[in-house]
């Protein structure tokens, strides 16, 4: 976070105290773990893949989640997550016109799930965990943020990502997505204003990437367990 806050110093000098405090705090650590994507590579005790909450993404669980949502197995489902981009209203009319696709919209419903044609509005406290929603879908549209990136990476499904260039960490995250994930870059303007059909067709044609059984979370857990066994 000290690195992330640095660009704000010119307009907000008060960040200097926060940056100094964080650097001092970090320097007291006995061990250093970095998880991909890494913005500032350094000497570490463990380098790990992206860390996401575990998913119950076996075939049976994926089918069960889709059945719970009311999605048929043959339907192409796109999860849309736009948290963190203030004031963004989803282009629902454009989504409705993409009749060959269904759109899963977490946090966009009221207290209960609502289905409107090919739009599936889910409440914020949806009973299905977010990693399992992603694993049950065929692709994701979303802004570039660590948790979304890590969960899509874990699922291995295509990602149409919207980079927030005004955030310092966005470029390293986008570079990682381009290199390690089936993906298409997408501007916020294109998402909100342009026809989505062609982009979605190209997105869903990208091959999935199978991930190994050892996740970033399991690697870190094993490392910490090793420390506790001393």
Question: Where in this protein do the model-derived segments appear?
Answer:
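Short acidic active-site motifs
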Residues: 128-129, 148, 195, 219
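Short loop/helix-cap segments at secondary-structure boundaries that form the rim of catalytic
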Residues: 26, 39-48, 93-97, 109-119, ...
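A nucleotide-sugar donor-handling region in carbohydrate enzymes
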Residues: 1-87
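C-terminal amphipathic helix plus adjacent low-complexity
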Residues: 197-230
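Short gly/pro/ser/thr-enriched loop/turn and capping motifs at secondary-structure boundaries
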Residues: 1-6, 111-112, 167-170
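A donor-sugar binding/catalytic signature common to diverse glycosyltransferases
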Residues: 129-172
């Amino acid at each position: 976070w000290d690195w992330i806050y640095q660009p704000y110093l010119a307009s907000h000098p008060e960040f200097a105290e926060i940056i100094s405090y964080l650097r001092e705090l970090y320097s007291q650590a006995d061990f250093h773990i970095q998880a991909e994507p890494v913005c500032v590579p350094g000497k570490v005790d463990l380098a790990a893949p992206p860390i996401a909450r575990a998913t119950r993404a076996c075939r049976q669980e994926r089918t069960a989640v889709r059945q719970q949502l009311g999605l048929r197995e043959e339907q192409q489902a796109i999860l849309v997550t736009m948290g963190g981009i203030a004031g963004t209203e989803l282009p629902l009319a454009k989504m409705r016109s993409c009749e060959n696709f269904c759109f899963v919209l977490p946090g966009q419903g009221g207290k209960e799930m609502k289905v409107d044609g090919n739009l599936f509005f889910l409440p914020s406290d949806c009973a299905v965990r977010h990693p399992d929603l992603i694993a049950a879908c065929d692709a994701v549209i979303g802004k570039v943020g660590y948790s979304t990136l890590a969960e899509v990476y874990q699922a291995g499904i295509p990602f149409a990502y919207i980079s927030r260039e005004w955030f310092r960490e966005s470029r390293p995250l986008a570079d990682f997505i381009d290199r390690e994930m089936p993906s298409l870059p997408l501007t916020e303007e294109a998402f909100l204003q342009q026809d989505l059909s062609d982009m979605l067709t190209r997105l869903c044609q990208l091959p999935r990437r199978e991930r190994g059984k050892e996740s970033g979370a399991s690697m870190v857990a094993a490392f910490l367990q090793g420390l506790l066994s001393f």
